[in-house]
């Protein structure tokens, strides 16, 4: 079937989004053109500005349009003395929504993966080491994903922290709230049992 070259280009562009296949891209394109052209223009403008103006924070490496992000420049967070190490900026949003952390962050933009040729410098560990050396830190919280690569990355950073006398901790992981034990995989259940705590009455 022959379609407009611009329409084809739009559908192909939409497919760069995660989880968007040919049918989803087609539906999105037709919806924007048929029902919401003003929304499509807003989307185009927002994408253009974001792609050209959003960079990385000089301190924590998260996304920001400033040299240093609002979290890193917050005096209260600077005094906290804690840094939470995460794999992606999306992890910061997830942690911030809990309201349980009031320190600063460091974003790896990935994890160690020797098989893929991703080493310490590729995920900014040289910059993290500079912070360990120059800042007065009370704790580094390792919040990498509970995968083989995430665990290896956390262990590597933990050893790095020990070299500078900075306390390192790993976030707990285990059975999800509302989950049923019979549906939980063996590795997760093992972590839950190993990380159990006493009930205090």
Swiss-Prot record:
Family matches, as SMART domains: TOPRIM
Record keywords: DNA damage, DNA recombination, DNA repair, Metal-binding, Zinc, Zinc-finger
Described function: May play a role in DNA repair. It seems to be involved in an RecBC-independent recombinational process of DNA repair. It may act with RecF and RecO.
Keyword Cell membrane tagged: no
Family to which this protein belongs: Belongs to the RecR family.
InterPro entries: DNA_Rcmb_RecR (IPR000093), Rcmb_RecR (IPR023627), Rcmb_RecR_Znf (IPR015967), TOPRIM_dom (IPR006171), TOPRIM_RecR (IPR034137)
Ranges for domain Toprim: 81-176
Record-given protein name: Recombination protein RecR
Organism from which the protein derives: Enterobacter sp. (strain 638)
UniProt signal peptide: none
